[in-house]
Protein backbone atom coordinates (compact mmCIF):
# COMPACT_ATOMS: atom_id res chain seq x y z
CA UNK A 1 0.00 0.00 0.00
CA UNK A 2 1.41 3.43 -0.90
CA UNK A 3 2.13 5.87 1.90
CA UNK A 4 1.96 9.65 2.20
CA UNK A 5 3.87 12.00 4.43
CA UNK A 6 1.85 14.75 6.10
CA UNK A 7 2.72 17.51 8.54
CA UNK A 8 0.61 17.81 11.68
CA UNK A 9 0.94 19.89 14.82
CA UNK A 10 2.46 18.46 17.97
CA UNK A 11 -1.00 18.63 19.57
CA UNK A 12 -2.54 16.58 16.73
CA UNK A 13 0.32 14.06 16.95
CA UNK A 14 -0.18 13.61 20.70
CA UNK A 15 -3.94 13.20 20.22
CA UNK A 16 -3.46 10.52 17.55
CA UNK A 17 -0.82 8.81 19.66
CA UNK A 18 -3.17 8.70 22.67
CA UNK A 19 -5.87 7.05 20.53
CA UNK A 20 -3.62 4.14 19.52
CA UNK A 21 -4.89 0.94 21.15
CA UNK A 22 -1.46 -0.76 21.08
CA UNK A 23 2.10 -0.26 19.89
CA UNK A 24 1.19 -2.23 16.75
CA UNK A 25 -1.65 0.19 15.98
CA UNK A 26 -0.61 2.59 13.21
CA UNK A 27 -1.75 6.20 12.86
CA UNK A 28 -3.59 5.09 9.71
CA UNK A 29 -5.46 2.52 11.82
CA UNK A 30 -6.46 5.23 14.29
CA UNK A 31 -7.66 7.63 11.59
CA UNK A 32 -9.65 4.95 9.77
CA UNK A 33 -11.20 3.71 13.01
CA UNK A 34 -12.42 7.17 14.01
CA UNK A 35 -13.28 8.42 10.52
CA UNK A 36 -14.73 5.54 8.49
CA UNK A 37 -15.82 6.13 4.89
CA UNK A 38 -19.52 6.35 5.71
CA UNK A 39 -20.89 7.98 8.83
CA UNK A 40 -24.39 8.66 9.96
CA UNK A 41 -25.36 12.32 9.95
CA UNK A 42 -26.42 12.00 13.59
CA UNK A 43 -22.88 10.88 14.51
CA UNK A 44 -21.30 13.83 12.72
CA UNK A 45 -23.72 16.29 14.33
CA UNK A 46 -23.12 14.79 17.77
CA UNK A 47 -19.38 15.21 17.26
CA UNK A 48 -19.52 18.87 16.21
CA UNK A 49 -22.09 19.79 18.86
CA UNK A 50 -24.87 22.39 18.71
CA UNK A 51 -24.60 24.78 15.77
CA UNK A 52 -27.60 27.11 15.33
CA UNK A 53 -26.23 28.48 12.05
CA UNK A 54 -25.97 24.99 10.56
CA UNK A 55 -29.43 24.06 11.89
CA UNK A 56 -30.94 27.17 10.25
CA UNK A 57 -29.22 26.39 6.94
CA UNK A 58 -30.44 22.77 6.99
CA UNK A 59 -33.98 23.89 7.80
CA UNK A 60 -33.93 26.42 4.95
CA UNK A 61 -32.64 23.91 2.38
CA UNK A 62 -35.07 21.26 3.59
CA UNK A 63 -37.97 23.68 3.08
CA UNK A 64 -36.73 24.57 -0.39
CA UNK A 65 -36.44 20.89 -1.31
CA UNK A 66 -39.99 20.18 -0.06
CA UNK A 67 -41.33 23.14 -2.05
CA UNK A 68 -39.55 21.92 -5.19
CA UNK A 69 -40.95 18.42 -4.69
CA UNK A 70 -44.46 19.90 -4.41
CA UNK A 71 -43.93 21.80 -7.70
CA UNK A 72 -43.00 18.49 -9.35
CA UNK A 73 -46.23 16.92 -8.07
CA UNK A 74 -48.42 19.91 -9.00
CA UNK A 75 -46.70 21.67 -11.95
CA UNK A 76 -49.41 24.39 -12.07
CA UNK A 77 -48.33 25.92 -8.75
UniProtKB/Swiss-Prot annotation:
This protein's record includes keyword Lipid metabolism: no
Q: Which key words tag this protein in UniProt?
A: Toxin-antitoxin system
Which family does the record claim for this protein? Belongs to the UPF0330 family.
Question: Do you know which HAMAP family this protein is assigned to?
Answer: UPF0330 (MF_00794)
Described by its record, this protein's role is as follows: Possibly the antitoxin component of a type II toxin-antitoxin (TA) system. Its cognate toxin is VapC3 (Potential).
Name recorded for this polypeptide: Putative antitoxin VapB3
